[in-house]
């Protein structure tokens, strides 16, 4: 990005604004609270407390045009091979809508709709049995997305099926889950793109044995033959996914099977509708009015121009407590790259470390560092305008904390006692859902997906591969024989010492 024609001008704006007080920016642009705010369907965004002004934004948009960001969106939605290292499309958007006239995207949309119809039929069959509980086994993209949505949207009471998620290879996770269940009234779903994932295969074997066979086992995989063979699952109970959908973008596919079981098939379809509506905004809205673009450019500005190494996400709705963990994978696995599309080294820092938690709990853990620490941490505050629980006073208090914390972070407060002084100047974006509905959550997740893509285009990297996860897995497989005492051929001296400790 530093090699673009407009970078010097952008850098000059950063130098000008780095030490600017956020109240001074608001004073200089009196209409800023509304001019930097956007309503897109059920989502409201306010960027007024970010440390840029109109001139800096114009410079950011100029670089976005130089990087052909609008064309990049077209290539993504039309099914071109934007995943250049694996020579694949990234058509997660086709799982939820058909927004272009590109034949490949339309074909993928039709294929996904057919599989979704099959999934709906399987759900009807399951609901007609005496099964009360579902154990969903997967990891990474096969777990984080479904777990987030199921937890956020599950009914408070009266659910026909209870869905439990197991991901960690640690046997304690499976033991604790199965201890509360009856195998005669439980079904299992094994989700793995390749069906070669160690965690899913080991946990799947435990679940298969505990259930007494495969009669109530289902699978979702891009390798359905291997899935059926590995656990003797009838082909009719195996749902496909495809190599044109990355794992962390797959909750909209049959990977969402446990979501639909937890919240109902109709509400699962509403989730997809909400995502498709935001997709249309991302694809068709001019850059300067495009919220996904502005969110992504804001992340680039904070990372590359203001030097922020981390980004916090605070969800002021307990039902969204798992969103920071989901975004951690979505953002860091997509953008944690050090080479560009052509294999050359990047010319600027890429992804920030994303982290966070649920408010107001986090105010009593890490907010001390946000307010008075030496690192400036940009943040997203996410809340809901309307809540459907019966405790209205609690919701008012919750939203009061959103308003108070964002104001305090931005404005700070002087004191004659340095220990009680707040420097301010901490930027944040506020995102408000009209209510936590399937449509709103679908739109929110879609926004973050597109923000990630914007950042990848600005940096010239591939958001859709994840080769960085492979080496550790390969070494773990090689070390298994040594841990079992079958081999002692380990080259690394520290690993040898640790093995001796583990083997006693």
UniProtKB/Swiss-Prot annotation:
Family, as annotated: Belongs to the GPI family.
Reactions performed catalytically: alpha-D-glucose 6-phosphate = beta-D-fructose 6-phosphate
Source organism of the structure: Xanthomonas oryzae pv. oryzae (strain MAFF 311018)
GO biological processes: gluconeogenesis; glucose 6-phosphate metabolic process; glycolytic process
Gene that this sequence comes from: pgi
Function: Catalyzes the reversible isomerization of glucose-6-phosphate to fructose-6-phosphate.
NCBIfam families assigned to the protein according to its UniProt record, in alphabetical order: PRK00179.1
Keyword Magnesium: no
Protein's name in the database: Glucose-6-phosphate isomerase
Name of a matching Pfam family: PGI
SUPFAM superfamilies membership: SIS domain
């Amino acid at each position: 990005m530093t090699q673009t024609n407009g970078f010097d001008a952008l850098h000059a704006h950063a130098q000008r604004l780095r030490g600017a007080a956020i109240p001074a920016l608001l004073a200089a642009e009196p209409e800023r609270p509304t001019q930097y705010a956007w309503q897109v369907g059920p989502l409201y965004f306010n960027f007024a407390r970010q440390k840029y002004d109109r001139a800096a934004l114009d410079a950011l948009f100029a670089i976005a045009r130089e990087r052909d960001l609008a064309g990049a969106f077209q290539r993504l939605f039309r099914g071109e091979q934007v995943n250049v290292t694996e020579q694949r499309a990234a058509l997660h958007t086709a799982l939820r809508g058909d927004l272009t006239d590109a034949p490949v995207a339309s074909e993928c949309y039709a294929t996904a709709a057919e599989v979704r119809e099959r999934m709906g039929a399987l759900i009807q069959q399951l609901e007609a049995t005496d099964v009360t509980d579902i154990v969903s086994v997967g990891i990474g993209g096969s777990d984080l997305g479904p777990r987030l949505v199921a937890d956020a949207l599950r009914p408070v009471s009266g659910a026909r099926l209870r869905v439990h998620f197991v991901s960690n290879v640690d046997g304690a996770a499976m033991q604790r889950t199965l201890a509360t269940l009856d195998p005669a009234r439980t079904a299992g779903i094994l989700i793995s793109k390749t069906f070669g994932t160690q965690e899913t295969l080991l946990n799947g074997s435990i679940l298969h044995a505990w259930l007494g066979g495969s009669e109530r086992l289902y699978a979702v995989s891009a390798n359905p033959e291997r899935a059926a063979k590995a656990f003797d699952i009838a082909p009719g109970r195996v749902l496909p996914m495809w190599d044109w959908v990355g794992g962390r973008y797959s909750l909209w596919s049959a990977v969402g099977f446990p979501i639909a079981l937890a919240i109902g098939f109709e509400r699962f379809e509403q989730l997809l509708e909400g995502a498709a509506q935001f997709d249309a905004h991302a694809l068709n809205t001019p850059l300067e009015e495009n919220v996904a673009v502005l969110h992504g450019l804001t992340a680039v500005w904070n990372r590359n121009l203001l030097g922020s190494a981390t980004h916090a996400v605070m969800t002021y709705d307990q039902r969204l407590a798992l969103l920071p963990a989901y975004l951690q994978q979505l953002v860091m696995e997509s953008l944690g790259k050090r080479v560009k599309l052509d294999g050359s080294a990047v010319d600027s820092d890429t992804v920030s470390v994303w982290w966070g938690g649920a408010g107001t709990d986090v105010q009593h853990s890490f907010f001390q560092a946000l307010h008075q620490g030496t690192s400036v941490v940009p943040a997203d505050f996410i809340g809901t305008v309307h809540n459907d629980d019966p405790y209205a006073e609690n919701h008012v208090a919750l939203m009061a904390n959103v308003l108070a914390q964002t104001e305090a972070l931005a404005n700070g407060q002087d004191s004659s006692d340095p220990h009680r002084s707040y420097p301010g100047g901490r930027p944040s974006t506020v995102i408000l859902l009209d209510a936590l509905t399937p449509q709103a959550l679908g739109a929110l997740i879609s926004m973050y997906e597109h923000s990630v893509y914007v950042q990848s285009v600005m940096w010239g990297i591939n958001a859709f591969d994840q080769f960085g996860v492979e080496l550790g897995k390969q070494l773990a497989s090689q070390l298994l024989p040594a841990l079992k005492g079958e081999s002692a051929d380990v080259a690394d001296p520290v690993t040898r010492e640790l093995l001796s400790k583990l083997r006693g």
